[in-house]
């Protein structure tokens, strides 16, 4: 009888905790809805273009809440740590190196994608430095701007300013992660270079009229703006089939360490890419 009462008590506590977690998540989503404001015209276009790239890149306009991953929130490291912990729970077999690499890529992908969409799609640049991001379980999806600041210009005019914003953001993310683990600048710089060059490859795939020379020149501008070595250009190769550029990354995302996963097509460890690199 006592054993039954003890089990009932434990179950009651667990159910209460689950209900509290559910309502906490609902309140966070409700805050986003309540504080959402009508976005300026440019931002509406950015949001529309973003969703065409992927539904996970969902933008909004309004106040940021305390759970946002943003340069204005010194407690961002708590949400980033929850991303890391979620990855560790979902993929315990992959190990710490994968969890950290994946966490870094997750906090960086949206600012980079939004920057590229804005510059190459709309010849504009919103206030990327102050972008807010949201965590959903072990994923970072959804972003928000709380002001309508923006600039217009050609890619050549906007890339230096975008580089400054990206450098400020990535340094902030690194400092936040440093609150709970060691993360080297050299490690994050390689990942950033791969993300930038990979975005340019996607740009050419989306717009095949952009020549290899143009993409290479743009790559030089991005590397310079983000204070990354120009030798990263060696990662760009000519695809034998399409004649377009392809990327062989410097860094490995380590996803192959997850159960039932393989090397990515652009992985430096992939046998085909080892032949190309020689």
Could you say what each language-model-derived stretch is?
Residues 6-12:
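Low-acidity, Ser/Thr- and Arg-rich intrinsically disordered low-complexity segments
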Residues 5-6, 113:
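Intrinsic structural disorder/low-complexity segments
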